[in-house]
Amino acid sequence: VAVDTLGRDGGYLNNPLVRIALPEGLQQAAQLMRTLGQGARVDALETAMNRAAEQAVPQAKSLLVGAVKSMSVKDALQVLQGGETAATEFFRERTRTPMGEKFLPIVTAATQKVSLAQKYNAIAGQAQKLGLLGEQHASIERYVTERALDGVYTMIAEEEKKIRQDPIGTGSRILRSVFGALK
């Protein structure tokens, strides 16, 4: 459910829980650019970052299904008896690294297609000139990939909380979709 929600147009961009904003080091520069009438450039950059994440997310489904298929009885008991996000933590431990490896090339291709790296570097360059950003900022591709991964697990956690609060209503609908995907 989380993957389907995030993988559609606006899945990240229109969801305040997972929307990918500019890196913290660029927030001040973005605000200054908005003040100077350059808000459209900032918005275009943020939109492109979120679209790149939306394109990568469908790759998560096979990894999440694989994690469920490989779940041992011990794992299942730990998830059932664990806290409100025990399943999310199980998925994070089992899938974050391989998911990141699948996301990164897609994010990289998406950012190159829309010249995101150049847009980011233009804003980062202006921020650097103003002393608002150091040279050590991460690559935009890795930043977007990490935020995309965070978004997947945030949405899984939200679904898990709903299931634990209403296991009959919400849980049966989601379990049907999960086990339907296992076929």
Regions found by a protein language model. Name each.
Residues 148-183:
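A cross-kingdom marker for long, charged
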Residues 1-48:
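N-terminal Sec/ER secretory leader and immediately downstream segment
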Residues 106-147:
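An amphipathic alpha-helical core segment
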Residues 13-17, 44, 74, 147-150, ...:
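Extracytoplasmic
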Residues 2, 72, 167:
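Residue-level signature of catalytic and energy-coupling elements of molecular machines
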Residues 93, 97, 134, 138-142, ...:
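Pore-lining and gate-forming transmembrane alpha-helices of multi-pass membrane transport proteins
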